[in-house]
């Protein structure tokens, strides 16, 4: 009525479903509130010419104000009904919790950084979480004491807990989504988790309230002395890249150990997983005491585990002075940005990369508009990142220079359509579903002409036809190679990715070029059509190739999605630090 009175055309209950719980129009419904969404087109300045006439900035302010006043007025009139609704809602939530065969959720991770971030999220929503006080084996998976937690469903935040933990299985008649159809948060955080029935929940040894406040940091290693040869940083923790970046920016020498090793420490022998970073205490341009101060920061501020090694010799794994231990350098990152359009970059995708590097890893990022970048910028950087967007503004001359820069040691990282552009330009010998190289497009067009045309359809079904074959945001199960340097820090072979789009990498001649592939049965939560599931089964999500002295690393998806998909961020930081720690296989003789 408000908009009718203003003479403004409006629409309701079209296109925007309330399925995804992250919407402002959905999230309050998990907390006993009645949400309303009012979305308005921007004037993009003072005045914009639209299909409905001129849209003025002052008009948009008036409409927002009138909508807010009308909503508040209606809420005041319906106060008693809203209060009764909220009382019923919480009572119904308690009944639903008791009727649910799932009584609790348990979760754990070898990465206590991601585990801590998830605890903070639950605590921020006033969800009661309890540490497990003894080791538990649930569905064949070990949940270690004090490194695992359990959330019981019978509490005030029942609906929110279910929204966070449950696997999304949309109704069969709902195949069209505005964007996200699956968001199971333990998958997003890369946590092992399990739904517990009444028997399992009753046996779980839950104790003190779980939070990150007051949790003790790992034990400090001994201060340097004549007997401490090097410090070794365990790469398993989410914050390890930040700690290593700080060390590298102090111009210390550091190396990555490619295999699991057994170290001799002042406290005895210690097993350290592959990907650990070695920091020698001697022959550095910094005193041993100053080096130790950085190690103390890594332990106390970043929460990482650091060991003091007494010798280069290891009973198992690479010796610390071995030829397979690769030197690291501080990444100097160039991020392509610019307004989205025919030649522009997704500001969301670029912002997510900036946030991870600048805010979480403390890596400086140079951001240059895609229409202004030139060869001079390349020489000042070790890495260039192209996220989702359009790169038609990059000239053939720049592409040739980029290829030379990569061969000379540069690292190109592409995500989503940034990866598609790299494949099309032939930056590396990597193939992607539905993407043809520029020099092969004519041949591809001939192949398209030979394809069978689709069956005739009714035009009124076109919108659903277009949308149901799109993957707008599901959770896909993946298989990671944790022995590849880009997979260092992961425990086991399972990983979950946010899948948006229908692209994946084809297996090529390099049997080690696919670091992460989609599982044979990839859909873990949300919706993807049977056609897309079959098409993407076993295809690559992360592909990498050495090109001369440099590397090309491509993601079919966005590993930094909305800054909360922590489970795949390690893949991105590995691409920064370990991009030259892998090699191409030797050529095979032709049969």
Model-derived features: positions:
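Intrinsic-disorder/low-complexity accessory segments
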Residues: 1-9, 14-16, 20, 24-591
């Amino acid at each position: 009525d408000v908009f009718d009175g203003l003479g403004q055309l409006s629409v309701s209950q079209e296109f925007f479903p309330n399925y995804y719980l992250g919407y402002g129009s959905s999230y309050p419904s998990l907390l006993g509130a009645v949400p309303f969404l009012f979305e308005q087109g921007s004037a993009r300045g003072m005045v914009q010419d639209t299909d409905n006439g001129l849209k003025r900035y002052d008009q948009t302010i008036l409409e927002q104000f009138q909508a807010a006043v009308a909503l508040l007025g209606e809420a005041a009139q319906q106060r008693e009904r809203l209060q009764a609704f909220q009382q019923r809602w919480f009572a119904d939530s308690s009944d639903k919790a008791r009727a649910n065969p799932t009584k609790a959720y348990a979760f754990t991770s070898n990465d206590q950084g991601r585990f801590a971030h998830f605890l903070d999220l639950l605590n921020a929503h006033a969800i009661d979480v309890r540490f497990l006080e003894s080791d538990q084996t649930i569905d064949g998976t070990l949940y270690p004491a004090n490194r695992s937690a359990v959330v019981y469903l019978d509490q005030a935040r029942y609906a929110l807990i279910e929204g966070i933990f449950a696997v999304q299985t949309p109704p069969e008649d709902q195949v069209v989504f505005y964007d996200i159809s699956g968001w199971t948060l333990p998958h997003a955080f890369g946590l092992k988790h399990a739904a517990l029935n009444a028997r399992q929940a009753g046996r779980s040894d839950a104790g003190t309230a779980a939070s990150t406040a007051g949790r003790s940091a790992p034990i400090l290693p001994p201060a340097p002395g004549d007997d401490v040869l090097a410090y070794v940083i365990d790469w398993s923790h989410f914050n390890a890249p930040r700690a290593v970046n700080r060390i590298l920016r102090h111009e210390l020498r550091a190396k990555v150990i490619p295999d699991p090793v057994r170290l001799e420490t002042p406290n005895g022998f210690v097993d350290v997983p592959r990907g650990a970073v070695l920091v020698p205490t001697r022959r550095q341009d910094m005193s041993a005491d100053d080096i130790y101060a950085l190690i103390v920061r890594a332990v106390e501020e970043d929460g990482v585990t650091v060991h003091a090694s007494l010798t280069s010799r290891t009973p198992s794994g690479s010796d610390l002075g071995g030829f397979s231990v690769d030197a690291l350098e501080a990444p100097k990152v160039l991020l392509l940005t610019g307004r989205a359009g025919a030649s522009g970059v997704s500001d969301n995708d670029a912002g997510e990369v900036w946030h991870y590097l600048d805010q979480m890893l403390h890596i400086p990022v140079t951001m240059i508009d895609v229409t202004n970048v030139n060869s001079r910028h390349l020489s000042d950087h070790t890495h260039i990142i192209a996220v989702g967007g359009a790169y038609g503004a990059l000239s053939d001359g720049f592409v040739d220079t980029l290829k030379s820069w990569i061969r000379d040691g540069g690292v190109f990282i592409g995500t989503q359509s940034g990866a598609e552009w790299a494949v099309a330009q032939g930056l590396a010998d990597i193939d992607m579903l539905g993407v043809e190289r520029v020099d092969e497009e004519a041949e591809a067009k001939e192949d398209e002409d030979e394809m069978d045309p689709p069956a005739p359809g009714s035009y009124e079904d076109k919108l659903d036809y277009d949308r149901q074959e799109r993957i707008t945001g599901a959770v896909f199960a993946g298989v990671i190679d944790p022995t590849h340097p880009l997979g260092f820090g992961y425990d086991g072979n399972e990983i979950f990715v946010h899948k948006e789009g229908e692209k994946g990498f084809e297996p090529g001649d390099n049997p080690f070029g696919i670091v992460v592939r989609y599982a044979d049965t990839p859909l873990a939560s949300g919706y993807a059509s049977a056609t897309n599931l079959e098409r993407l089964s076993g295809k690559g999500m992360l592909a990498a190739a050495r090109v001369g002295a440099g590397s090309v690393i491509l993601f079919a998806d966005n590993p930094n999605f909305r800054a909360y998909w922590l489970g795949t961020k390690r893949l991105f930081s590995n691409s920064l630090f370990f991009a030259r720690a892998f090699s191409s296989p030797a050529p095979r003789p032709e049969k």
